[in-house]
Every structure is written in C-alpha cells, then in structure tokens.
Amino acid sequence: MKNKGKIIQILGPIVDVKFNENQLPKLLNALTIEFEKTKITLEVAQHIGNDVVRTIAMSSTEGLVRNLEVIDTEAPISVPVGKNVLSHMFNVIGENIDNQSIDPNTEKWSIHRKAPSYEEQTATSEILETGIKVIDLLVPYVKGGKIGLFGGAGVGKTVLVQELINNIAVHHGGLSVFAGVGERTREGNDLYYEMKASGVLDKTALVFGQMNEPPGARMRVALSGLTMAEYFRDELNQDVLLFIDNIFRFTQAGSEVSALLGRMPSAVGYQPTLATEMGQLQERITSTRKGSITSIQAVYVPADDLTDPAPATTFIHLDAQTVLDRNIASLGIYPAIDPLASASRMLSADIVGEEHYKIAREVQRILQKFKELQDIIAILGMDELSDEDKNIVYRARKIRNFLSQPFHVAEKFSGIKGTFVKLSDTLRSFRDILDGKYDDLDESAFLYVGTIEEAKQKHLKNYKGDHVEK
C-alpha cells in the first residue's frame, strides 16, 4: 500500500506535507501530487517534527491547495539513462520535453549518487585539442578534467560554450550531455536546432531547467544531466563530454532554497552549505578506470568579482580556469579570454612539451610587460619608450589581436567564416611572431584570422587596397 500524506502549508516552492505517524518518507525521496491532469514532483528536504516533512517543488506550485493528497514514491528523483536518451531533451525529473516519445522501459537511475571511490578514480594528462588558439596555447584543457569559463554578463561565455560543443563534439565524435541550468530558454532552443543541423544531436542528450523554473528544478537539473553522463561512463565505458551552462545558477538556486528553508545565510547572503553542495556535484565529475567525463562549465561572475563566494568556491575544483575579461571584449577582441588571469594545471613542460611551454610562457611574458608599460604610454606616449620596449609593445599588440579568432557559431553575427586551428599551426604561428618574422605586418592583419598565413594574406589585401585608393 502506498504511503500517503496531505499538504498542510504552501510557501511558494516550499510545500509542507503531513504523514501518518512512523511513516515519514526518507530525506531526498520524491513525492508526487496529481491534480487537474497535472503531476507535480516534490523532493523531501527536511523533517520538521510532528510527522511533517518540508519539501521543494520541481515545478510551479500554482493551483495547489491544502489537504491535497501526496504520494511517497519511496525513491529519489530518477531520470532515464542509456542510449535511448540520445537526441532527446529532458526536464529535471527526466520527462521528455521535445514531443518525441522514448521507450517507456528505459532504465532509470537516481540523481543522487555517491562519487567514485579513490580506488576507482584514475589520473590523466591527455590534452584535449579545442581548435581555439588562445585556449590550446595558454590554457590547455585535459581530457577527463573540469574546465571553468568565468565571466560577467555579456562577455561571451555561452558563445564560447557553443563553439566548444561544435569543435570538440564534432571532432571527438563521442557522446555529450548538455545541462542548461537557469539560463535563457531561447538559447536552449537555438542550441537544440544548431545541434540538429550539425548532426551532433544523435550523440547528445540535453537536460534543461531554465531561469523561468522554480529554484528546486534549477538546483537539481545539473545532477540530472550528470547522472546521464555517469551511466555512459560507468556502464558503456565511454569518454563523455558534459557541458553545464551555468554553474552559478545552480548555486543561486541553492541560495534561494536555503532561504526558503529558513537556514541562516553566510557570506554575501549565500547558503551556509555552499561548499558542500558544490563538492557533491563536482566530485562526481571525474575519470574512472571505465571511462571519463570531461566537464566544461560556464560560471557567471557577479559584478565581475572573482572573489565572490560562488565563483571562488567553483575555482578550487577545476583543472583549468578560463577567465573572460570585459576590457578585452570592449576592444572588440573575441573570445575575450584574459591570457594572464587564465590558468591550467596542464601548462607544464612535462605534459605539453618543452617547446609549447616555452612559447606559452614567452607570450605571457610579453603581454605582462605590455600591461606594465600601458600606464607609461598613457601619460608620456610611445616616444618615451626605449627601442626594446617599443618592440615589445608592437609585438604584444599583434599577439593580442592574433589571440582573437572567428567562431563557427558566430558566423551569422560576424559574417566571418569560423576556423578550427590545429595546435601545431598555433605553435608555429606564435613562434614566428615571437621571433620577429612578422614585425613588418600591420597589427590589424592579425585580427580575426586563423593561421599566420591568413594574416599575411589579409595584410597584402589591405596593402593593395590602400595603394589602389591612393
């Protein structure tokens, strides 16, 4: 016989349910309410005494009234897993939302799972080539690692995530899971049709809990997507790509739920359990002896402040931090990745090789020197610099421009054809710039090109155009 209770209080997305004595559902159990042809799922968050449980709703609670019947499913929220989920779109509780049915007998897994043990985990140092120059050169990504894309509003996080999906998913050919956490529904819709057009959708599962949904859904949707990825890793022995946009919204939803549950807020109003919740999610994203999950996570930075507790808590879990900078975006250089603030534990001579390491460090040295000279240039002008410093400034500007790149996913905005640049071409191009082989080229020729050959062609084209005009 099913364990049943009744609603006794509704406070927005928080619903209190009273059960019979000694029949309380376990913490994290899913409860269901059926009324007016709709089904609402709740998750048990607290036992508050007097046989009452406090729950978080996974969808809107509009229309609910007290004394409605609630049924304990006697299990946590479960989502479908396996090959049947590929090419489909789901919500937080695993319901198909793309109007295409999937096999009702598809296996389901609980979204709350333990992280792999130390014995099961494995370390890897295989580099993941992205085809994006600034990333491959200065912030190399590791296969099976966790990568964060940090940036404030409007600096290009989502476009960068979509380009990485295009480049890595198309070129690596494995399985991918995309979790849309608290972001714009329009972007999720665009992504679905772009994936369909590029032929990647057949190898991808999409899970969405967008910004119009209650905090419960936004807090759990990342776990739903991760569970699907874990199945591919553990049962099918696959190397999986997991894209999460945006991990900050996961934290934000947790903060909303925490306040509604009556917990005392901690620093800057965040939930006191911030580090625990982040750890429970991030520790499950790892490589095991069976397969790997490579995770690329967009992280919104409130007010461009990287010391804010939400991005700061995310930082410690990542293998590579790609920081997008508003000042670089304001120069019209995209991707607006800050080459000095971004870092990767893979940028070591033992992993990427001596040549790559030396080129990357020399590029960073020149850009750092350029940054130091900017105050002098602003006050005294270029004429007061030594010849050596002038040379550094000219090369740094070329390097800064050459770190830009036309994206495939931005073709419709920019009108410039996107490029995938091989690592060997990236290293060769930057080595030649550092050696002074292209000191005679105009710095504008380096903007939005793929390889150095394209920069030479652009320079010649500009040079001829100038002469024709004269």
From Swiss-Prot:
PROSITE patterns: ATPASE_ALPHA_BETA. It comes from the Bacteria. ATP binds at G151, G152, A153, G154, V155, G156, K157, T158. CDD domains: ATP-synt_F1_beta_C, ATP-synt_F1_beta_N, F1-ATPase_beta_CD. Pfam families: ATP-synt_ab, ATP-synt_ab_N, ATP-synt_VA_C. It is an enzyme of class 7 (translocase). InterPro entries: AAA+_ATPase, ATP-synt_VA_C, ATP_synth_F1_bsu, ATPase_a/bsu_AS, ATPase_alpha/beta_chains, ATPase_F1/V1/A1_a/bsu_N, ATPase_F1/V1/A1_a/bsu_N_sf, ATPase_F1/V1/A1_a/bsu_nucl-bd. GO terms for molecular function: ATP binding; ATP hydrolysis activity; proton-transporting ATP synthase activity, rotational mechanism. Its EC number is 7.1.2.2. GO terms for cellular component: plasma membrane; proton-transporting ATP synthase complex. Disulfide bonds: none annotated. Coiled coil: none annotated. It is found in: Cell membrane. It is a peripheral membrane protein. Keywords: ATP synthesis, ATP-binding, Cell membrane, CF(1), Hydrogen ion transport, Ion transport, Membrane, Nucleotide-binding, Translocase, Transport. It catalyses: ATP + H2O + 4 H(+)(in) = ADP + phosphate + 5 H(+)(out). Belongs to the ATPase alpha/beta chains family. F-type ATPases have 2 components, CF(1) - the catalytic core - and CF(0) - the membrane proton channel. CF(1) has five subunits: alpha(3), beta(3), gamma(1), delta(1), epsilon(1). CF(0) has three main subunits: a(1), b(2) and c(9-12). The alpha and beta chains form an alternating ring which encloses part of the gamma chain. CF(1) is attached to CF(0) by a central stalk formed by the gamma and epsilon chains, while a peripheral stalk is formed by the delta and b chains. Produces ATP from ADP in the presence of a proton gradient across the membrane. The catalytic sites are hosted primarily by the beta subunits. HAMAP family: ATP_synth_beta_bact. This is ATP synthase subunit beta. It comes from Mycoplasma mobile (strain ATCC 43663 / 163K / NCTC 11711) (Mesomycoplasma mobile).
